[in-house]
C-alpha cells in the first residue's frame, strides 16, 4: 500500500507504507475491527481436550457448557462478545501452561506469519500496549523442548513417511 502517496509501495524504507500494508493484509485476512483475538481461560480439571484445537471453532455458549471461564472467573461472553461467537482452544505450552480461546482475529495474525508463538506474541503485545494484564497462568520453564537439529530430524522422518510438510528446516 502506498500510504505516503509518493507513487511507490515501499514496505522496507517507509514505516507508514509498511504499517498500512500490514493493516491491509490483516483486513483481507478477515480481521474484525473491535473484536478480540482471544483471551486466557480457565479449564476444569475434568476437561477432555482431545481433538480440540484453535482451528476447531465452537460457540462460546458451548465452551461455557463445558465448564470454561475467563481466567479471572468471569463469563466467556460479555461486553460486545456474544455467546454465539466462535472460538478455538489453544494450549501452546501444553496442559501445564496457559490456555486460550482464540477467535478469527488470531487466525488473521497467524495467516501473516504461520507460527502460533508469533501470533500469540503480537496479540498479547497489543493487549499490553492498551493496558492489558500479563498472562495469569505461568509458562512452564522446566521443559527445554527439542533442539533445532531434533526438529529437523523429525521433519525428515515425516517427509520420508510421505507427509508433505515442505522443506525440513528445523
Q: Which ranges hold each PLM region?
A:
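Sec-exported extracytoplasmic/periplasmic mature domains
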Residues: 1, 23-31, 127-134, 159-163
Amino acid at each position: 500500500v502506498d500510504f505516503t502517496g509518493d507513487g511507490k509501495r515501499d514496505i522496507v524504507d517507509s514505516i507508514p507504507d509498511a504499517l498500512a500494508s500490514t493493516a491491509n493484509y490483516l483486513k483481507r485476512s478477515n480481521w474484525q475491527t473491535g473484536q478480540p483475538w482471544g483471551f486466557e481461560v480457565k479449564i476444569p480439571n475434568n476437561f477432555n481436550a482431545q481433538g480440540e484445537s484453535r482451528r476447531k471453532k465452537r460457540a462460546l455458549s458451548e465452551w461455557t457448557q463445558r465448564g470454561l471461564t475467563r481466567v479471572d472467573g468471569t463469563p466467556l461472553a460479555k461486553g460486545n462478545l456474544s455467546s454465539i461467537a466462535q472460538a478455538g482452544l489453544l494450549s501452546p505450552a501444553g496442559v501445564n501452561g496457559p490456555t486460550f480461546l482464540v477467535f478469527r482475529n488470531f487466525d488473521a495474525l497467524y495467516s501473516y506469519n504461520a507460527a502460533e508463538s508469533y501470533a500469540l506474541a503480537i496479540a498479547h503485545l497489543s493487549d499490553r500496549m492498551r493496558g492489558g494484564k500479563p498472562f495469569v497462568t505461568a509458562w512452564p520453564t522446566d521443559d527445554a523442548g527439542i533442539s533445532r537439529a531434533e526438529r529437523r530430524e523429525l521433519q525428515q522422518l515425516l517427509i520420508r513417511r510421505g507427509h508433505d510438510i515442505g522443506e525440513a528446516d528445523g
